[in-house]
Amino acid sequence: MSGADRADLPKSPPDFRILRGKTNEFMIRIYEATEPSDLLAEAFARLLPQLSERMTAPDREAVARIVASPATRQLVAAAEDGRIVGLLSVALYDVPSGRKAWIEDVVVDAATRGRGIGEALVREALALARREGVARVMLTSNATRRASHRLYERMGFVRYETDCFRRDL
């Protein structure tokens, strides 16, 4: 990673965690993206298609809007070299039934899966939701992502029956 790329990293002190994966240890840092950057835009472009073939990466202007939105938080997992290896979005909102959070777009780079990165991201999202006074956290996941579903269930998420509708505009 060049010096110019390193300048794109958050300025806060490094607080890396050691994750013990199935085959080795892996160091990551989880942080909230608060500024748009080329590094973040590249991560969206590289990782979102791994989540779904239908997803297209946001352009730099959209990344700026996403990061600036007061209703959403973007959590990032970075490897020791600064490379972003995982992303997660948390939407926070208030409705008459209480303050809630919705976790979406959880994706870990295929080359680094199985090392606890997804779990670390979700744990950080749950901690953020608690700090924000959230009473209930919802999470969406594609029906084909069975390994992810097992993780979410191990973490205390419960499947529930619902009819969810979507309409493209």
Indicate residue ranges for each PLM-predicted region.
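Conserved acetyl-CoA-binding loop-helix of GNAT-fold acetyltransferases
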Residues: 108, 114-127, 154
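Conserved active-site alpha-helix within GNAT-family acetyltransferase domains
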Residues: 119, 143-161, 167
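Hydrophobic adenine-recognition pocket in adenosine-nucleotide-binding enzymes
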Residues: 106-108, 141
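Conserved N-terminal entry element of GNAT/NAT acetyltransferase domains
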Residues: 10-38
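Acetyl-CoA-dependent GNAT
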Residues: 28-99, 104, 122-124, 159-160, ...
